[in-house]
């Protein structure tokens, strides 16, 4: 009995030492030896060699984190089945290693995400041991790069973090195999077009608004268009606008339908352009703006057409594209192929087209503004006689002046001159008369012949009893230095009457301070008035009437 007990103690001791000395002996052998009868179980278990682990040590092996006891080889520990069956065979060797707790399962790692403070570096170092992420292909990188970020899926922190680290690399550094076509396809609008239509207007650069393609089409087609009508059509919620090419004699027109938010929904062209595209549109618009500024006023406020007998005579205006109020005074473009558009035009626009042939057409069939002459006089009456005959056709109150403005037109047939008269807002005695255009005729004769036989000055009456001799020049060349108290009517051009008499003396009746432009304008009228006076004086001498005998009897 003593011998057997001592032998069992020696066997158990030897077996424990063999656990640390031999790769084939382990604590499992002791269990097999004690349970088997006659030692047959132990020999049968020893005949079965443990399978070798098919693991190759990675660049950073987890074995470097183990604190092995002195005298123990790490290779023996990897060859032992204790590493794989520690949960099945309870043994004192299971908790013998005082190292950190390792769990290679991703579920446990996800549950311990709150304890990431001091273990992030360790997880990154050995994450390739358990979850070795394969390098993504070029197609995968393209898809991942431009897709919007998604919430992390429940696959572990390490895998999601490695996926997020690949995104900036794929965006900033283009792979070697990606060509221009593939890159353009990767930037395609598939991820963005899947959203609702509210995401259609994308914001670019510094906050600019990217218009839809259909809206850029109307503004960037290279041609100049003028809007001439707009109306609400049946069967459509959007209003329809009508445009016409501004090039002379170009029959091209187009219809544009816009939605309520301003986006273009449909564009229909009618006809073809018979000219090339303009070279520089901005230069033409700049010159038009310069003409408007040079004219010194807005012609749109003169609504000529109320009493003139014609239907809304189009005024002199520069070509302003896309403006509904301004007309171009060129002849109407050919109607070939434009009947469909003319049927849809509003009635008011058709009326305005009846007067397209009127106006002053200059070079290039484009209407040019005539110069303006502004004369300011001090008078208590509104009607100032300048020698021409005028017809009043309108009156209205303009912005910035409480006094009404009266509009006049020259009564001579074919004369384009117009004027408007108003009193200044700061001084009620100041009458401002603005002339537009130039007269293409002479100054008409005054109504009646009494003006031709007005009494001569006292000095002229002393030298001759007959004021009008056949070889004597008319008295219009005489300009006395003293005031003339017998002026027949006030005058609006510095005191110079229409028939040569000086009103108000050498000081021009107090109407001083005119500039050179007004002076040249008045000198032109003076020459015309002198010619008319000479003509009427010669006719009066050739055919004397009863008034002549009556005048001679007075002297």
Curated annotation (Swiss-Prot):
Polar residues biased stretches: 277-294, 310-320
Chief location of this protein within or outside the cell: nucleus
Motif (Nuclear localization signal): 253-259
Bias kind Basic and acidic residues: ranges: 347-356
Biased segments, Low complexity type: 163-183
PROSITE patterns tied to this protein: WRKY (PS50811)
GO BP terms, alphabetized: abscisic acid-activated signaling pathway; gibberellic acid mediated signaling pathway; negative regulation of abscisic acid-activated signaling pathway; negative regulation of gibberellic acid mediated signaling pathway; positive regulation of DNA-templated transcription; response to abscisic acid; response to gibberellin
Name of this chain's protein: WRKY transcription factor WRKY24
Source organism: Oryza sativa subsp. japonica (Rice)
